[in-house]
From Swiss-Prot:
ZnF C2H2-type: positions: 187-210
Residue ranges with Low complexity bias: 346-358, 418-431, 447-461, 502-513
Pfam families per record: PAH_ZNF598, RING_ZNF598, zf-C2H2_13, zf_C2H2_ZNF598
Location within or outside the cell: Cytoplasm, Cytosol
SMART domains: ZnF_C2H2
Pathway involvement of the protein, from the record: Protein modification; protein ubiquitination
Subunit structure: Interacts with the E2 ubiquitin-conjugating enzyme UBE2D3. Component of the 4EHP-GYF2 complex, at least composed of EIF4E2, GIGYF2 and ZNF598.
Reactions listed under catalytic activity: S-ubiquitinyl-[E2 ubiquitin-conjugating enzyme]-L-cysteine + [acceptor protein]-L-lysine = [E2 ubiquitin-conjugating enzyme]-L-cysteine + N(6)-ubiquitinyl-[acceptor protein]-L-lysine
Species classification: Eukaryota, Metazoa, Chordata, Craniata, Vertebrata
Phosphotyrosine: modified positions: Y306
Name this polypeptide is given: E3 ubiquitin-protein ligase ZNF598
Alphabetical GO biological process terms: negative regulation of translational initiation; protein K63-linked ubiquitination; protein monoubiquitination; protein ubiquitination; rescue of stalled ribosome; ribosome-associated ubiquitin-dependent protein catabolic process
Residue ranges covered by zinc fingers (RING-type): 29-69
Organism: Homo sapiens (Human)
Amino acid sequence: MAAAGGAEGRRAALEAAAAAAPERGGGSCVLCCGDLEATALGRCDHPVCYRCSTKMRVLCEQRYCAVCREELRQVVFGKKLPAFATIPIHQLQHEKKYDIYFADGKVYALYRQLLQHECPRCPELPPFSLFGDLEQHMRRQHELFCCRLCLQHLQIFTYERKWYSRKDLARHRMQGDPDDTSHRGHPLCKFCDERYLDNDELLKHLRRDHYFCHFCDSDGAQDYYSDYAYLREHFREKHFLCEEGRCSTEQFTHAFRTEIDLKAHRTACHSRSRAEARQNRHIDLQFSYAPRHSRRNEGVVGGEDYEEVDRYSRQGRVARAGTRGAQQSRRGSWRYKREEEDREVAAAVRASVAAQQQEEARRSEDQEEGGRPKKEEAAARGPEDPRGPRRSPRTQGEGPGPKETSTNGPVSQEAFSVTGPAAPGCVGVPGALPPPSPKLKDEDFPSLSASTSSSCSTAATPGPVGLALPYAIPARGRSAFQEEDFPALVSSVPKPGTAPTSLVSAWNSSSSSKKVAQPPLSAQATGSGQPTRKAGKGSRGGRKGGPPFTQEEEEDGGPALQELLSTRPTGSVSSTLGLASIQPSKVGKKKKVGSEKPGTTLPQPPPATCPPGALQAPEAPASRAEGPVAVVVNGHTEGPAPARSAPKEPPGLPRPLGSFPCPTPQEDFPALGGPCPPRMPPPPGFSAVVLLKGTPPPPPPGLVPPISKPPPGFSGLLPSPHPACVPSPATTTTTKAPRLLPAPRAYLVPENFRERNLQLIQSIRDFLQSDEARFSEFKSHSGEFRQGLISAAQYYKSCRDLLGENFQKVFNELLVLLPDTAKQQELLSAHTDFCNREKPLSTKSKKNKKSAWQATTQQAGLDCRVCPTCQQVLAHGDASSHQALHAARDDDFPSLQAIARIIT
């Protein structure tokens, strides 16, 4: 009864305090926004719901106010609470572990219910005392599981936990819950194959248990490595790693961002260690040097002779023959008498100078008398040495050394050997001027090689006897060709712009992989290093003393071929030596081809009734077919050569590009330029091949490419008649004979070719509306036309289909920039045919009725012209520069005086 009375008294006191103070209950919680069924209040008087306060103090073990962060040692749970200072907390029910006071038993019951572990599927069962018991019950009875990661990291009440089946649990871990879009699953560490609560926990794990590059991390990269071995590889590849000495076992500190930092580290940390390692590799050996008398024995006077004058004068002649140890001891004693020796050395020098003056006076008297016995006597007597003769001790069997001198006068001639026999009266006297040298003979200088001709050797200028040249003068051997030995018939250096070059344009963008590169200059120049015989009598005479012909020389033609090589004019030495790669069978073939006489018959035009499909280039065999070519003599067309027995190809076959010739015999390319047939037989001595101007010389033997097959991608290309002479399908009714036009030559690049080509490409892209698929199709058609896979008419039609009416805007520039003269004529003919078909027949005037091959560029509506010399289609602005290029090629026709000078 007393206890009940005390409880009633506490309740009455609390109600009285609540009535006197304003109410703290009602409303919603500032944290969870839930109803304030029961309020938790601390000394800061900030009310929160009892759930949030219990979660903070019991589950999270945090005892501060969730509103103001003030540390709350005690809190009171109740439904209607006054100010905390007015509450008699010592009279309330108390939870000692968490310092929670309860206003009544109902609030305490709510608090205990929050912390109970009840099964959500079995409400009739009593609560479990531990969460592990509830988890075991759920797994056994209901086959439900809770997420271990959520259980470990999420501090929530038991009734708030989620239970999953096995399938749902796997989806929850990888993807998240369908009803909770804020959770996207638990991220996986690919190194450990373990999942973490969220990305923050995964990042903590990677930073704590794995490795990352601190250089890349400062730059914003998020790259991690499973162990340090992979990080070391990253340091070695992307940064600078020091692996010397102790740094090979260090981590992180031996990697550097820049090479300068690495060098500074090596200088500061490893320079001493490298010096120590080098010192450890040294082996200490005790040895001593013998006296150095070699320079004095050779008759050379140096500074050490004057330094050791007094030492030798004191030691005497006998002391110089002593042992090595005695000499070392005397040398040691000499060091301690430096001042005295200096004075004695000065006296010795003065004495030697006086003796030298006396010798010069005596020598002048002997020369005035001119008596030979006097000279011999003076030579036999020799100069009187004030110190006596100085000779180093010789071993047994050693011959007498050269004469020595201790003065600083001229060196005697005996110190230098002469290759020729010495004159009987030329004994050298020290200090005297050298006597007149005897006349040198050819026998005194035998040649070093028997095969070297006397005409090629360089005679040395006679000089004083005994004086040697500081360097050897190389004699011109029979294998050393000089440029002046071979005056050039044609300039060996091609003028820029005259030879066809590999052009970078829109035409070869799609077929660049199928081109064949010309031989590099390094391969051409290797021919100049091969030995050949020199022309003239010296070559024959030198051949007698040389080795006999080898088998290779006999296969190459023997002396006759070598003589041909030596007598023909060449443009350079490398082109002469490049002829060694020609086999005898090829030479015979060339002679046979060169002996053919040009005919006078004109080539018959192909039948005018050929179907349009004949313009398609079929796959032809790899063997070359020769077409009728006009003979050009002194620049005038006399008529084509008779057609050979090769099968005649259908008209319209495209011709291979001039920039990429196949390796063919040299007669196919005459020296005077232009597509000429084989000429008249050359004069004697000129039967060898004459290289084309601007054509690289053939490679040396062993480097000749096979001539049986054309380059890849050109197997279907055969030479064809000029397209201007082939009637098109639109002119099958014409009866006029076509006039003969000059054959197209190599394409000459116009001015600003690259800029104009880029502008053309951009224009085509704009007309195609930057459609890459259509632009790729255009490039594909262009490449097929350049390779001869489609005809000009087909290519023209495909371009019109792609560009429509805009094709006429770019066709003029497209035609001018096409780097192939033959293809230009084909495309121009196709354009003319199209224009003729578009015009009605009734509107044509009679004077303009011409065949398609006679149509001009003005009639076709083009702003261009055709060069009458090379048949290249030009813009009007390029005509002057193009004619200048033709004028620069006038050296293709050398003067007859130059040829006569070379022959004689």
